[in-house]
Amino acid sequence: MGSLSNYALLQLTLTAFLTILVQPQHLLAPVFRTLSILTNQSNCWLCEHLDNAEQPELVFVPASASTWWTYSGQWMYERVWYPQAEVQNHSTSSYRKVTWHWEASMEAQGLSFAQVRLLEGNFSLCVENKNGSGPFLGNIPKQYCNQILWFDSTDGTFMPSIDVTNESRNDDDDTSVCLGTRQCSWFAGCTNRTWNSSAVPLIGLPNTQDYKWVDRNSGLTWSGNDTCLYSCQNQTKGLLYQLFRNLFCSYGLTEAHGKWRCADASITNDKGHDGHRTPTWWLTGSNLTLSVNNSGLFFLCGNGVYKGFPPKWSGRCGLGYLVPSLTRYLTLNASQITNLRSFIHKVTPHRCTQGDTDNPPLYCNPKDNSTIRALFPSLGTYDLEKAILNISKAMEQEFSATKQTLEAHQSKVSSLASASRKDHVLDIPTTQRQTACGTVGKQCCLYINYSEEIKSNIQRLHEASENLKNVPLLDWQGIFAKVGDWFRSWGYVLLIVLFCLFIFVLIYVRVFRKSRRSLNSQPLNLALSPQQSAQLLVSETSCQVSNRAMKGLTTHQYDTSLL
């Protein structure tokens, strides 16, 4: 039972550790990365405005007028078929017949999924329907529309508003719409025509009864009170033509223009859910919904953002793209980021020195030297000093690696402020890893880094830490240096000197006695050459003669004295 509880505790500990170790990205990080790629931004701060609920503020970027003719939408239907789950009858071992239920799509209901307060410039073209009996989507104020096409429900034609310069720029139903414009030049021209907010206006002659409007991109013309929008050659595939069909069929004007019908071949080829063929009766009038799903395009009507036009809709709408309200900063002062908790202190400039990074206490078993160190406390001081020095060098390398990147984006590292408890807690590395956003006013800021500076510094830090282990265990310099550990006090010096002197005296006495005894016990053997031997023999003979003479002289003198 105890082992089982220990195992459960280990699992909980590992789970908690992994939870702390793995830091999820901020929810806005993927959006910021996508926008930075589209706009070719790197090594900068992207900030997005947040409201009180921390929801991102959206900006609507108007599309060019040519988008109405170059892009085609998708047909959807007011009701969508959904098959119910099949239920098996266990008594008969058979399945019930598949039943279907109907659901109205969000587009068909005319429901918006977002609200917009900012526009990036004006719309080059707005489309208006005044007399629709279906959902009211909202009206874009006329001052934000360079040109307006409104649908005439009496004859089923689009009519251009030729007197936009003389008519009132404000309608009664525009007072509830609050829109503002801004210019973000760093967005324009950076998206390969994905976000092209330059206006392509229609050219008109507003002072004549018979007027003619020409669009330079598509060649569509309006002449007098009639329009060839539905009959112009090669102009029956664009979004504007599909919108005309969406409105025309909603008013039941199928017989107004001869042979043209709402339920033509191009629509009957569409299929419903799960490849089920669409019944023909869906296509007769009010069940068509024009959608721009999965295209990146949206419709803005008033403040509401829509993905499609429901049948019989009314309002004044424009076409464009939906993006977060972003602000770009090349650098951010530390005082601008109000929710930084950590403090970064200045680090001593790095000195380019070469040296070992081994820490002997990590590799030498301290148990082997515990007894000796108890007798001689100073033993091992060199190892400790070297370890402390190497740790200091490693810390200096780490600070130097991060300092270069941080100083490039932080001009005043000494002015970092602490965050209040209500704000998100973060520091510069978490902001750059995009795990938390830095608060600048009411904006959420993330750092966009595509030069891989931070990752390269992290790699260098990893290599520096690995160098602490990749060192030779045998260091001759360290061996000689360890001798210095014995000379940490004069007491040890005197003890070592006396000990060495005593050993020297013992060795000297023993060696001297042994050498003297050897000299006395060994005979003298001389090695002489023949000449030296002859000379020595002559000398010996002379000495014998001399000795004999002296002996005889002595005997003679002795005899004389006796007489």
UniProtKB/Swiss-Prot annotation:
Disulfide bonds: none annotated. Residues 27-488 are extracellular. The keyword Cell membrane applies. The chain crosses the membrane at residues 489-509. InterPro entries: TLV/ENV_coat_polyprotein (IPR018154). Keywords: Cell membrane, ERV, Glycoprotein, Membrane, Secreted, Signal, Transmembrane, Transmembrane helix, Transposable element. Glycans are attached at N122, N192. Residues 1-26 form the signal peptide. Belongs to the gamma type-C retroviral envelope protein family. This is Endogenous retroviral envelope protein HEMO. The gene is ERVMER34-1.
